[in-house]
Amino acid sequence: MQVILLQRVAKLGQMGEVVNVKDGYARNFLLPQGKALRANESNIKSFEARKAQLEAQNLETKKEAAAVAEKLDGQSFVVIRSASDSGALYGSVTTRDAAEAATEAGFTVGRGQIVLDRPIKDLGLHTVTVTLHPEVVVKITLNVARSVEEAELQASGKSIQELAAEAEAAADFEIAELFDEIGAASQED
C-alpha cells in the first residue's frame, strides 16, 4: 500500500514522502497513529495544502523535545528490584519501569518512547535509549539494584560481584587470623 508520511518514521522516510509499505503495517500502525495517509489523489492534494502547517507543528514539537532532551540526556535513574545473590533479577526491568522511574523524577516520558534492545535481567548500570521525537534521541542510565545503598555503591563504580568477592575475601582473612591466634595460643600452653 502506498502512503504519504505525515511525520518522520524511523527506517521508512521523511515527512511528505510517498512510500510503499505492507498493508498490515499501514492499517494497524501508520494510519491509526496518524503518522501517514493513504496515497490517493484527494489525500495528496489535502497534504500539499496542509504541508506548511504540518512542518510548523513538527518544528514546534521538535523544539519541545530538544528542551526536554537537554535536561534528560545523561540522567541516571534508580530502579529497585529483588534479585538473587549472583545478581540475576526475579523478573525483568521493562520499558514501563524505565518510564515510571523517569516520570517519578519529574520528566514526561512515555513507555513507547523508551527503546530497550532486550529486557534488563540483571543488576547493574544499563544504558537505555529514549526517543523524544523522531529526530531527538537521548541516552539515560538505569541503575538496577536491590536497595538504595546498593544503587549508590554501583553509581560509585563498584559492582555487586566485586563487593561480594571483597566480603568473601575479608571473611576468609578473618578466619585465617582466628586460626593463627588459636594456633599461637595452643603453642603457649
Swiss-Prot record:
One of its GO terms (molecular function) is rRNA binding. The keyword RNA-binding applies. One of its GO terms (cellular component) is ribonucleoprotein complex. One of its GO terms (biological process) is translation. The keyword Disulfide bond does not apply. SUPFAM superfamilies: L9 N-domain-like (SSF55658), Ribosomal protein L9 C-domain (SSF55653). InterPro entries: Ribosomal_bL9 (IPR000244), Ribosomal_bL9/RNase_H1_N (IPR009027), Ribosomal_bL9_bac/chp (IPR020594), Ribosomal_bL9_C (IPR020069), Ribosomal_bL9_C_sf (IPR036791), Ribosomal_bL9_N (IPR020070), Ribosomal_bL9_N_sf (IPR036935). Keywords: Ribonucleoprotein, Ribosomal protein, RNA-binding, rRNA-binding. Binds to the 23S rRNA. Belongs to the bacterial ribosomal protein bL9 family. HAMAP family: Ribosomal_bL9 (MF_00503). This is Large ribosomal subunit protein bL9. It comes from Cereibacter sphaeroides (strain ATCC 17023 / DSM 158 / JCM 6121 / CCUG 31486 / LMG 2827 / NBRC 12203 / NCIMB 8253 / ATH 2.4.1.) (Rhodobacter sphaeroides).
